[in-house]
Amino acid sequence: MTKQNIFIDDIYWERVQLYVKGHFEGVKPTRNFLLRNLTETKLFNANHVNIQGSTFEARFNIAILEKGNFLSTGNYILINRQEDEYVCQINPKFLNDKKKQMTLEELRDYNSLETQSLQKSYLLKNYGKSFQRYNNKEIKSYVIVPAISQEINEFIFKVQYKSEINKISKLKHLSFILHKALRKISFNVRDKIYLSIFNISKTVYKNNKNHVLFTSDSRANMSGNFKFIYEEMLKQQLDKKLVIHSIFKPNIANRRSFIDKLKFPYFLGKSKYILVDDYHPMIYKLQFRENQEIVQVWHAVGAFKTVGFSRTGKKGGPFIDSIGHKNYSKAYVSSNNDILYYAEAFGIEEHKVIPTGVPRTDVLFDESYKTRIKQSLETKLPIIKNKKVILFAPTFRGSGHRTAHYPFFKINFARLASYCEEHQATVLFKMHPVSY
């Protein structure tokens, strides 16, 4: 099968006009070139496209591209839309030629970069454009730079507009400094109270052996792996021997109630067993007793993506000296094959990773449960009756809950729809909670 690609061979500027030259490989040449942001909420047509044979030249007037205004801040991919949609790629030969032209100093800077995407972006940095304006009151900066996105590993144009006050009044400056200082004082006071409650509780209950805490910063109730562990504990009547506590919060951005802010460090210090199922930043700075067990029952079923220290050097990943995850005494995973990957992700020794299987997958062996759930889904979604059902439940891209999104442009929906028609199938999308 012939490979289908659209390659970018050159980028150049004439005033506010951005020109992109390239060629088609195995793709029908068409003029329908567009810039689209990663969240697929903005789409802008090229002002002019010239095609000769298999080559193209697209022009974008960035000063008027967005409804008569300049292209707004964001990251944009270049696409060609026809029956299928193609994301334009930078030609590897173009990058190799740029690398050969580097000076020794540039080569040293290039080799010091941690990822291939950063290195490729370094080779592209001179193909951007910067517009600046200064006066006594304001500094304006508008920059467009071609790069390789660390989030989606695709060629993008990074657009950034900044407008800064050149001089601020002494009163405003003083207000800013005061506000910043008060926030720091407030944080330090709350942090000291949190640590004090934890340390007192840890000392008072140093010999405690019968308290268990379920806690999550991304779960509102006893669900997921927690639910199945808890139900098994009840089934074995362990609730008669153990005192079970739970502190939950729907997502990491939510604030705890005043009562939970006091109860949380108290239960952390008191409990012999502390079960978590996701990233939980409030526990990593604590010094637990040696006889306490911090047990990670990670929510994912297998090592399907990189997390934690497996993302060191990538955007949003921790640095090697981060304390995140490292105080787990045990982590339970789905199989022996996962031990290496979860030990790496959590920054813990491999013997602490135990392949028991994932609690919430037990239901896959419960025929009555499967029948009940299937009937429930068919009632809610009649479209799936008598169809092959495909569930797509991807992770997210972005550095956290504020920037979380999914790059839907990587899915060829036309081909997916064609497959569904041919095979009597329905695809269900279940997005990651962080990207809601």
What spans do the regions from the language model cover?
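Structural alpha-beta junctions
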Residues: E83-Y86, L234-H245, E349-H351, R415-T426
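Acidic/glycine-enriched edge-of-secondary-structure segments
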Residues: L178-R190, F214-D217, R360-D366, G398-T403
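Basic, ligand-binding patches in group-transfer machinery
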Residues: M1-N210
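Generic recognition of flexible, low-complexity loop/linker segments
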Residues: F7-D9, I200-K202, F264, I283-K285, ...
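Conserved catalytic-core segment of nucleotide-activated headgroup transferases in glycan assembly
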Residues: N221-E232, R360-Y436
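Active-site and donor-binding regions of nucleotide-sugar-utilizing enzymes
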Residues: H23, L35, L43, T55, ...
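A short, charged/proline- and glycine-enriched loop
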Residues: T203-L213, N291, K385-K388
